[in-house]
UniProtKB/Swiss-Prot annotation:
GO molecular function: DNA binding
Domain of life according to the entry: Archaea
GO CC entries: cytosol
Claim: Lipid metabolism is one of the keywords in the record: no
Signal peptide: none
Record keywords: DNA-binding
Protein name, as recorded: DNA-binding protein M1425_1752
């Protein structure tokens, strides 16, 4: 009776190997796709930003990667729709960052009402 068990174990091991190979292939394809998209994005940013503006964006990416990713996508969309002039200078990028900062700034006001006990 040990022969069928070893056969089942061999089948199971082969199935697991195939699944692992498929998963590895899928992950590799996904990594390649992401690298290709990142490469395309970088080439677009090289066209729409001056070197100084690209350096500022790189600095932002080091500190706030999620914000930088969102900003990159917004800049590309603005450039493609013609809403910003190309190439975008560092000063113009600073202005855009200030506008974003103002939009995101939240003023919290605490109101204290005096109520007398009557």
């Amino acid at each position: 009776m040990s022969a069928p068990n070893s056969y089942d174990d061999e089948e199971l091991e082969e199935l697991l190997r195939r699944k692992a190979a498929q998963e590895q292939k899928r992950l590799e394809e996904e990594r390649k796709r992401k690298a290709e998209l990142e490469s395309q994005k970088e080439s677009i940013l090289r066209v729409i930003l001056t070197p100084e503006a690209r350096q500022r964006l790189t600095n932002i990416k080091l500190v706030k990667p999620e914000f930088a990713e969102s900003l990159e996508n917004q800049l590309i969309a603005l450039a493609q729709s013609g809403r910003i002039k190309v190439p975008l200078t560092d000063e113009e990028l600073k202005q855009i960052l200030e506008q974003i900062s103002e939009q995101n700034r939240r003023d919290f006001k605490i109101q204290i009402r005096e109520r007398g006990w009557k």
